[in-house]
């Protein structure tokens, strides 16, 4: 790890043209460096949370670089927990680079990836779960990812984990007391009940792992079915506008078509595929094979069948993640099947029920409001394994498994985490955050 106290600086806004650009400066001596490159009210005399208008200058020549606002945040009431200064200049890359040059010349060094947030973590302003939430919030592309990240940044996940960890540590202390002073121990039933309650909470968190992954990375939704089954019409109905060409002639879609779609705050790519059927046409056969590959790779599949026509034999699909949809429900039915959701793309009948089914398939019953990174999921899986192990042991032998379960939970917030794991978390950040 780099030195934690030396002054660091970085451009904190995206590179390119813009109305405003921000350069951050943090660490020991940050206010003194800022004073040397500033023409205006002395930053060292400003109270924390105040700003002033002036000019950034080259102290060696006195040349003005840009008019700017200077903001001062004093330790420990700053993002990093250190004295921190922000220069808000015009958003020219030439200006921002020149400001960086004079700051480095005056003793600051360019910050590494995520170094401002790393300092916040090391100075106790954030735990590791909150630091990961900062990155997730920066990278959020959908509304659900934004909500998940903000809740985690506000400490919702950390508080939940800390409560579970404390319950295990309390139970561990009682079991130790039982071994040392048998007459004052806890009843076996109480220990089992506590373990089962903690395990249920861990399971509830893990149940949201899929929704968290989809919220952060997006999902692919494939529409599969026979020619003229109504796939393109259903896609248009879900989108709310006409994206796919619709025709009564079977086989209109011979290749796949993609369209971005956000449902329940999750960024989706909906894929309308070629009709799946037996065919001698080599071009159409290629489209069918591609459609089945797309279904295999999709996060969720809609198997679309025309309810007004005889039901075709089903193609090979990943049924565990497939919803069955009976289209053209406004026409007289040729068959009935309770496994299929009846939908009319023409009238909109059944679209609400289909969206609810999509919601549950994507988010699960828990609702998907918890941000979980891959690292955190691994820690929860380890905790679950140790809790299950503890439940299978007599009370006087479950101490080690309990201790390891508590340690696994502590990994989520960074209490029990190796330095290389911390480094791996922060190297995913951009410079300036």
UniProtKB/Swiss-Prot annotation:
<dbReference type="InterPro" id="IPR005225">
    <property type="entry name" value="Small_GTP-bd"/>
</dbReference>
<dbReference type="InterPro" id="IPR027266">
    <property type="entry name" value="TrmE/GcvT_dom1"/>
</dbReference>
<keyword id="KW-0819">tRNA processing</keyword>
<dbReference type="InterPro" id="IPR025867">
    <property type="entry name" value="MnmE_helical"/>
</dbReference>
<feature type="binding site">
    <location>
        <position position="252"/>
    </location>
    <ligand>
        <name>K(+)</name>
    </ligand>
</feature>
<dbReference type="GO" id="GO:0005829">
    <property type="term" value="C:cytosol"/>
</dbReference>
<feature type="binding site">
    <location>
        <position position="433"/>
    </location>
    <ligand>
        <name>(6S)-5-formyl-5,6,7,8-tetrahydrofolate</name>
    </ligand>
</feature>
<comment type="similarity">
    <text>Belongs to the TRAFAC class TrmE-Era-EngA-EngB-Septin-like GTPase superfamily. TrmE GTPase family.</text>
</comment>
<dbReference type="InterPro" id="IPR027417">
    <property type="entry name" value="P-loop_NTPase"/>
</dbReference>
<dbReference type="Pfam" id="PF01926">
    <property type="entry name" value="MMR_HSR1"/>
</dbReference>
<keyword id="KW-0963">Cytoplasm</keyword>
<dbReference type="InterPro" id="IPR031168">
    <property type="entry name" value="G_TrmE"/>
</dbReference>
<comment type="function">
    <text>Exhibits a very high intrinsic GTPase hydrolysis rate. Involved in the addition of a carboxymethylaminomethyl (cmnm) group at the wobble position (U34) of certain tRNAs, forming tRNA-cmnm(5)s(2)U34.</text>
</comment>
<feature type="binding site">
    <location>
        <begin position="228"/>
        <end position="233"/>
    </location>
    <ligand>
        <name>GTP</name>
    </ligand>
</feature>
<keyword id="KW-0479">Metal-binding</keyword>
<dbReference type="Pfam" id="PF12631">
    <property type="entry name" value="MnmE_helical"/>
</dbReference>
<feature type="binding site">
    <location>
        <position position="232"/>
    </location>
    <ligand>
        <name>Mg(2+)</name>
    </ligand>
</feature>
<dbReference type="GO" id="GO:0030488">
    <property type="term" value="P:tRNA methylation"/>
</dbReference>
<feature type="binding site">
    <location>
        <position position="228"/>
    </location>
    <ligand>
        <name>K(+)</name>
    </ligand>
</feature>
<feature type="binding site">
    <location>
        <position position="249"/>
    </location>
    <ligand>
        <name>K(+)</name>
    </ligand>
</feature>
<dbReference type="InterPro" id="IPR027368">
    <property type="entry name" value="MnmE_dom2"/>
</dbReference>
<feature type="domain" description="TrmE-type G">
    <location>
        <begin position="218"/>
        <end position="363"/>
    </location>
</feature>
<keyword id="KW-0342">GTP-binding</keyword>
<dbReference type="GO" id="GO:0002098">
    <property type="term" value="P:tRNA wobble uridine modification"/>
</dbReference>
<dbReference type="GO" id="GO:0005525">
    <property type="term" value="F:GTP binding"/>
</dbReference>
<keyword id="KW-0630">Potassium</keyword>
<feature type="binding site">
    <location>
        <begin position="272"/>
        <end position="275"/>
    </location>
    <ligand>
        <name>GTP</name>
    </ligand>
</feature>
<comment type="subunit">
    <text>Homodimer. Heterotetramer of two MnmE and two MnmG subunits.</text>
</comment>
<feature type="binding site">
    <location>
        <position position="247"/>
    </location>
    <ligand>
        <name>K(+)</name>
    </ligand>
</feature>
<feature type="binding site">
    <location>
        <begin position="247"/>
        <end position="253"/>
    </location>
    <ligand>
        <name>GTP</name>
    </ligand>
</feature>
<dbReference type="InterPro" id="IPR004520">
    <property type="entry name" value="GTPase_MnmE"/>
</dbReference>
<dbReference type="GO" id="GO:0003924">
    <property type="term" value="F:GTPase activity"/>
</dbReference>
<dbReference type="Pfam" id="PF10396">
    <property type="entry name" value="TrmE_N"/>
</dbReference>
<keyword id="KW-0547">Nucleotide-binding</keyword>
<feature type="binding site">
    <location>
        <position position="24"/>
    </location>
    <ligand>
        <name>(6S)-5-formyl-5,6,7,8-tetrahydrofolate</name>
    </ligand>
</feature>
<feature type="binding site">
    <location>
        <position position="86"/>
    </location>
    <ligand>
        <name>(6S)-5-formyl-5,6,7,8-tetrahydrofolate</name>
    </ligand>
</feature>
<feature type="binding site">
    <location>
        <position position="125"/>
    </location>
    <ligand>
        <name>(6S)-5-formyl-5,6,7,8-tetrahydrofolate</name>
    </ligand>
</feature>
<dbReference type="InterPro" id="IPR018948">
    <property type="entry name" value="GTP-bd_TrmE_N"/>
</dbReference>
<protein>
    <recommendedName>
        <fullName>tRNA modification GTPase MnmE</fullName>
        <ecNumber>3.6.-.-</ecNumber>
    </recommendedName>
</protein>
<dbReference type="InterPro" id="IPR006073">
    <property type="entry name" value="GTP-bd"/>
</dbReference>
<keyword id="KW-0378">Hydrolase</keyword>
<keyword id="KW-0460">Magnesium</keyword>
């Amino acid at each position: 790890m780099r030195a934690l106290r030396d002054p660091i600086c970085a451009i904190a806004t995206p590179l390119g043209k813009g109305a405003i650009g921000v350069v951050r400066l943090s660490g020991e001596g940050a206010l003194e460096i800022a004073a040397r490159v500033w023409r205006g009210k002395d930053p060292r005399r400003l109270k924390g949370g105040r700003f002033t208008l002036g000019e950034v200058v080259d102290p060696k020549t006195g040349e003005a670089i840009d008019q700017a606002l200077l903001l001062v945040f004093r330790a420990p009431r700053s993002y990093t927990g250190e004295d921190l200064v922000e220069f808000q200049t015009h958003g020219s890359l030439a200006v921002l680079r020149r400001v960086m040059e004079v700051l480095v010349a005056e003793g600051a060094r360019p910050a590494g990836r995520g170094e401002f947030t790393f300092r916040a973590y090391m100075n106790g302003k954030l735990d590791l779960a909150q630091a990961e939430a900062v990155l997730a919030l920066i990278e959020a592309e959908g509304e659900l990812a934004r909500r998940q990240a903000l809740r985690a940044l506000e400490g919702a996940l950390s508080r939940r984990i800390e409560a579970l960890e404390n319950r295990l540590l309390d139970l561990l202390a009682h079991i130790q007391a039982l071994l040392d002073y048998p007459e004052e121990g806890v009843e076996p039933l109480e220990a089992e009940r506590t373990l089962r309650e903690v395990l249920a909470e861990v399971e509830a968190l893990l149940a949201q792992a899929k929704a968290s992954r989809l919220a952060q990375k997006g999902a692919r939704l494939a529409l599969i079915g026979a020619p003229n089954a109504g796939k393109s019409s259903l896609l248009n109905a879900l989108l709310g506008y006409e994206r796919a060409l619709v025709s009564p002639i079977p086989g209109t879609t011979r290749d796949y078509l993609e369209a971005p779609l956000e449902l329940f705050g999750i960024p989706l790519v909906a894929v309308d595929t070629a009709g799946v059927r037996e065919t001698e046409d080599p071009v159409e056969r290629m489209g069918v094979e591609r459609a089945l590959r797309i279904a295999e790779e999709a996060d969720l599949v809609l198997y679309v069948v025309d309810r007004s026509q005889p039901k075709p034999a089903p193609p090979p699909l990943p049924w565990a993640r497939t919803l069955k949809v009976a289209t053209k429900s406004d026409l007289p039915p040729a068959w009935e099947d309770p496994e299929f959701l009846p939908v009319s793309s023409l009238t909109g009948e059944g679209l609400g029920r289909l969206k609810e089914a999509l919601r549950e398939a994507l988010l699960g019953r828990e609702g998907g409001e918890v941000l979980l990174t891959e690292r955190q999921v691994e820690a929860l899986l380890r905790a679950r394994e140790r809790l299950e192990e503890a439940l299978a042991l007599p009370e006087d032998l479950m101490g080690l498994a309990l201790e390891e379960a508590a340690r696994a939970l502590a990994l989520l917030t960074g209490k029990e985490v190796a330095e290389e794991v911390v480094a791996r978390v922060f190297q995913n950040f951009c410079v300036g955050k």
